[in-house]
Amino acid sequence: MHTRAIYPGTFDPITNGHADLIERAAKLFKHVIIGIAANPSKQPRFTLEERVELVNRVTAHLDNVEVVGFSGLLVDFAKEQRASVLVRGLRAVSDFEYEFQLANMNRRLSPDLESVFLTPAEENSFISSTLVKEVALHGGDVSQFVHPEVASALAAKLNLAKA
């Protein structure tokens, strides 16, 4: 098991679904890099630095996981990190078509980069960062969907936005 894998995403914020996939990827690969995309087109609620910090806190117990922010093409980031595998999550069949297109594009751009798809545990299959933010924005309790530190950070971020 000498493979370096990248699990890329925006992680705005990291959810229990993300954490579940990270834990399982950490068992499959020698080294897992969580690549947090700057992705300004998504207009994230948390800054890149805040997202890196939150993911670091959630994954602190995993010795073979490293969290790195990046911008630009994912395949270029993978080359910089000497990773040969991309880990992607599939929550539902609806995710498959988009992920299939991404995998094929990434293969064209970097033929040696292999995409591996993991499905979340059933209890996490419906969770998305967008839904978590929506629930939190309307005053709902998100504690069952995110790590306690993420719930606190989200509450603080939303309270600042309201002020």
Curated annotation (Swiss-Prot):
Protein name according to UniProt: Phosphopantetheine adenylyltransferase
Annotated residues for binding of ATP: 10-11, 18, 89-91, 99, 124-130
Cofactor(s) the protein needs: Mg(2+)
Associated pathway: Cofactor biosynthesis; coenzyme A biosynthesis; CoA from (R)-pantothenate: step 4/5
Enzyme Commission code: 2.7.7.3
Lineage of the species this protein comes from: Bacteria, Pseudomonadati, Pseudomonadota, Gammaproteobacteria, Alteromonadales
Pfam families: CTP_transf_like (PF01467)
GO BP annotations listed: coenzyme A biosynthetic process
Domain of life of the source: Bacteria
HAMAP family named in the record: PPAT_bact (MF_00151)
Family: Belongs to the bacterial CoaD family.
Binding partners and assembly: Homohexamer.
GO cellular component: cytoplasm
Keyword annotations: ATP-binding, Coenzyme A biosynthesis, Cytoplasm, Magnesium, Nucleotide-binding, Nucleotidyltransferase, Transferase
Organism: Shewanella sp. (strain MR-4)
Known role: Reversibly transfers an adenylyl group from ATP to 4'-phosphopantetheine, yielding dephospho-CoA (dPCoA) and pyrophosphate.
